Regions:
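N-terminal pre-catalytic "stem/leader" segment of glycosyltransferase-like enzymes
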Residues: 32, 75-81, 85, 192-201
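Short helix-terminating capping/connector loops at secondary-structure junctions
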Residues: 6-9, 77, 110-114
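Active-site neighborhood of HAD-like aspartate-dependent phosphohydrolases
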Residues: 2-56, 159
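Flexible, charged surface loops at secondary-structure boundaries
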Residues: 5-9, 74, 125-130
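Substrate-recognition element of Asp-dependent hydrolases with the DxDx(T/V) motif
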Residues: 60, 65-95, 101
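C-terminal cap/substrate-recognition subdomain and adjoining C-terminal extension
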Residues: 88-201
């Protein structure tokens, strides 16, 4: 099919959910304090708010996120997917994330931007291939391996969705810069294959 052939030449943009598409704090603000207190410290000094049942269903989009995604989706150069992680201790969050995508991106039918294009994994690096980018706020769960193809949301370079749109639509690196970066990525990838420390025993 022509559509399938065209997709082969598109850049894939993976987009994280928490604090990239989704405003985590907006959901947390709606949770009663007595419930939040149960997830604030389990003896490790860490908060586990993402384990609160139903919290993801309460969250709102990050400012500008919905319009920005629609702009990227309308650009013929890109093919969009959501690449996110869901908490292992909160099974309901996996379903809540799907429902959130359906709600805000009309993805309950095959005309939706993210219809059957939601990937939930703790190993985002498994999705690395040619012409792939990741918009993520953290270098965790394999996102750090995207290296120069990681657009780290919330940083000085990419503080908001306007800056992300400017990069992908107005300021994507030139063909010369992309060639150099692709060569660097390929070299790093081949070196990792030769590194015995990264191989399973």
């Amino acid at each position: 099919m022509q559509i399938e052939r065209d997709n082969r030449f598109k850049h894939i943009i993976y987009i994280d959910m928490d604090n990239v598409l989704v405003d985590f704090q907006s959901g947390l603000d709606k949770v009663p304090q007595e419930i939040k207190a149960q997830y604030e410290d389990d003896g490790t000094g860490k908060q586990h708010y993402d384990d609160i049942p139903g919290i993801f269903s309460l969250m709102e989009p990050m400012p500008g996120a919905v319009d920005a995604v629609k702009a990227l989706a309308a650009h013929k150069r890109y093919n969009l997917y959501i690449l996110s992680t869901a908490p292992w201790g909160n099974p309901g969050a996996w379903a809540d994330k799907l429902e959130w995508v359906k709600k805000y991106f009309d993805s309950d039918n095959n005309d939706g931007i993210f219809y059957k294009k939601l990937i939930l994994t703790h190993h985002k690096n498994l999705c690395i291939q040619r012409r792939t980018w990741l918009i993520d706020d953290r270098k965790a769960h394999g996102s750090q391996h995207f290296e120069h193809h990681l657009v780290q949301f919330g940083t000085e370079k990419f503080p908001d969705w306007d800056s992300v749109i400017d990069f992908f639509i107005g300021g994507l690196p030139s063909s010369v810069e992309r060639t150099a970066r692709n060569q660097a990525w390929a070299t790093h990838f081949l070196e990792s294959l030769d590194d015995d420390s990264e191989k399973p025993e």
